[in-house]
């Protein structure tokens, strides 16, 4: 087993989700990559590529470590909705998602030594209630959308917009724990309910 685990993400949500299964990375190191979707790239292709590139970017600088990376994207049909850049874009996202079903895809990647990067993808279906102009304006003003794929955060106020969810709540938050646990165990990391309990109540 490698000497340490690095989380290739700046997301505090992913760090908190790892703690739920008793995992505490030795280092948190966000990858510095271009996250612009390629022309014609489908949401599934994009999210797999992003998670892979994040893991490989960090691995190229810490080849002796295990690298865990993840990427989340909201997709309305074939359209990729990355993080909103400003209030105008966040508003347009919410108008698009209002009253309709969309997908939330999270890819998680594990890179160790010189082995090929292993990637697993969790696909989830989310349906929003119909949002009034006032609700959209109020949510955008809250700032909760900042740094969130699709312009909303399921772990915050926006959860009250969700009429239906099929899939993994942790995946929509940014890290599917089922797939992550599988990757970590295959990489040789000891995971147990007791270690998770100790981490939570330490």
From Swiss-Prot:
Pfam families associated with the record: Maf
Cofactor entry: a divalent metal cation
Family listed: Belongs to the Maf family. YhdE subfamily.
Subcellular location, record wording: Cytoplasm
UniProt function note: Nucleoside triphosphate pyrophosphatase that hydrolyzes dTTP and UTP. May have a dual role in cell division arrest and in preventing the incorporation of modified nucleotides into cellular nucleic acids.
GO BP term, pick one: nucleotide metabolic process
The enzyme's E.C. designation: 3.6.1.9
MF annotations from Gene Ontology: dTTP diphosphatase activity; UTP diphosphatase activity
InterPro entries, A to Z: ITPase-like_fam (IPR029001), Maf-like (IPR003697)
Residue numbers marked as site, Important for substrate specificity: 13, 72, 155
Chemical reaction(s) catalysed: dTTP + H2O = dTMP + diphosphate + H(+); UTP + H2O = UMP + diphosphate + H(+)
Keywords: Cytoplasm, Hydrolase, Nucleotide metabolism
Top-rank taxon, per record: Bacteria
CDD domains attached to this UniProt entry: Maf
Keyword Nucleus: no
Keyword Hydrolase in annotation: yes
Active-site residues (renumbered): 71 (proton acceptor)
One GO term describing the cellular component: cytoplasm
The protein's name: dTTP/UTP pyrophosphatase
Species, as recorded: Zymomonas mobilis subsp. mobilis (strain ATCC 31821 / ZM4 / CP4)
SUPFAM superfamilies according to UniProt: ITPase-like
Coiled coil: none
Predominant place of localization: cytoplasm
